[in-house]
Amino acid sequence: MDAPGAPAPAAAPSSARKELKIVIVGDGGCGKTSLLMVYCQGSFPEHYAPSVFEKYTASVTVGNKEVTLNLYDTAGQEDYDRLRPLSYQNTHLVLICYDVMNPTSYDNVLIKWFPEVTHFCRGIPTVLIGCKTDLRKDKEQLRKLRAAQLEPITYTQGLNACEQMRGALYLECSAKFRENVEDVFREAAKVALSALKKAQRQKKHRICLLL
């Protein structure tokens, strides 16, 4: 314990390791858990098991800085709509995921997920992720979609949804084939760090104005 009147500990240098909290949301079965497991554990789950709430930790290098990512997987099912907001506290960024082969999960980006995130995480940046891109070439999946008079969601449609929700970035990935998986989290970390710097500059500016 510091003695009375002792000087406060020096502030951590700017090169200190950063920690970011990132929450991942999206419809149940859209691919968000597989994305997290491949990135953090290197393994793709062959069988779908609904998540409730799980935390994963990983490290990423942004520029010359090591950043710790605390990644929170959430339940997309309606049964958890009242519990899920507990995950949003003190988050730095939200990844909104959808399945490019499931038009309903795409529609829910703007119908459900964006409004929910905006309500509970006002001012927090979002990144939109199109998952399961490998299935765009899967003949059986295409047959099922077309039998229902539906088509896979295109990259352009994903980009349009991102623009409508004023997302910071739109990315696509295939967890099964590890395509763009690392890019998703590296770019998400960049967006979150940039938002933090901007908030700190604004805070300093307000302090200067008050003085």
UniProtKB/Swiss-Prot annotation:
Keyword GTP-binding attributed: yes
Protein name stated in the entry: Rho-related GTP-binding protein RhoF
SUPFAM superfamilies: P-loop containing nucleoside triphosphate hydrolases
Record-level Gene Ontology MF annotations: GTP binding; GTPase activity
Propeptide: 209-211
Modified residues (N-acetylmethionine): 1
GO biological process: actin filament organization; small GTPase-mediated signal transduction
Species lineage: Eukaryota, Metazoa, Chordata, Craniata, Vertebrata
Transmembrane region(s): none
InterPro entries, alphabetized: P-loop_NTPase, Small_GTP-bd, Small_GTPase, Small_GTPase_Rho
Organism: Mus musculus
Disulfide bond residue pairs: none
Main location class: membrane
Domain of life, per lineage: Eukaryota
Record keywords: Acetylation, Cell membrane, Cytoplasm, Cytoskeleton, GTP-binding, Lipoprotein, Membrane, Methylation, Nucleotide-binding, Prenylation
Positions where Cysteine methyl ester occurs in the chain: 208
Coiled-coil residue spans: none
Topology versus the membrane: Lipid-anchor
Residue numbers binding GTP: 26-33, 73-77, 131-134
PROSITE patterns per record: RHO (PS51420)
Gene3D superfamilies recorded: P-loop containing nucleotide triphosphate hydrolases (3.40.50.300)
Record-linked Pfam families: Ras
Sequence similarity: Belongs to the small GTPase superfamily. Rho family.
Cellular compartment(s): Cell membrane; Cytoplasm, Cytoskeleton
Record's GO cellular component terms: cytoplasm; cytoskeleton; plasma membrane
Lipid attachment points (S-geranylgeranyl cysteine): 208
Entry-linked PANTHER family: RHO FAMILY GTPASE (PTHR24072)
